[in-house]
């Protein structure tokens, strides 16, 4: 007779909280990526100021523009290095929706930090508006990733 352990209790998945004003998880994800050195109040301040700037420039709900920007930035495929018989191949893999959103937010913030001049909330708002219009450095990063995956399509069988 074999001993079987009782069924393990399933842990609840961590649900990301939403912010106080917009009540949106995407906003919370963005703010948590803006965050540096534990200064969450400053991260919220930067985010809300950029929302205000977006609204002043477009007269459209800034949340819609952020969703559109992140949707256009979300990659469908990416490459992953895999070592096969002594050589490293870049293998294209599909990106899950959650991971794609995380990558899009990361690229958006990296490209907004690289912009010259201005304050962070101005740089962030301009990068978000550019991404929504399918322009900007973050869009180039996405296209570069897709191009890499396309050129390494022959190595897809190594998955």
From Swiss-Prot:
UniProt similarity note: Belongs to the universal ribosomal protein uS7 family.
Protein name: Small ribosomal subunit protein uS7c
Pfam families, sorted: Ribosomal_S7
Keyword Cell membrane: no
Localization terms from the record: Plastid, Chloroplast
Spans annotated as Disordered: 137-159
Main localization, broad class: plastid
Function field: One of the primary rRNA binding proteins, it binds directly to 16S rRNA where it nucleates assembly of the head domain of the 30S subunit.
SUPFAM superfamilies referenced in this protein's UniProt entry, alphabetically: Ribosomal protein S7
GO MF annotations in UniProt: rRNA binding; structural constituent of ribosome
Self-association and partners: Part of the 30S ribosomal subunit.
Bias type Basic and acidic residues, positions: 141-150
HAMAP family associated with the record: Ribosomal_uS7_B
InterPro entries: Ribosomal_uS7 (IPR000235), Ribosomal_uS7_bac/org-type (IPR005717), Ribosomal_uS7_CS (IPR020606), Ribosomal_uS7_dom (IPR023798), Ribosomal_uS7_dom_sf (IPR036823)
UniProt keyword annotations, A-Z: Chloroplast, Plastid, Ribonucleoprotein, Ribosomal protein, RNA-binding, rRNA-binding
GO BP annotations, alphabetical order: translation
Gene Ontology cellular-component annotations: chloroplast; small ribosomal subunit
Segment forming the signal sequence: none
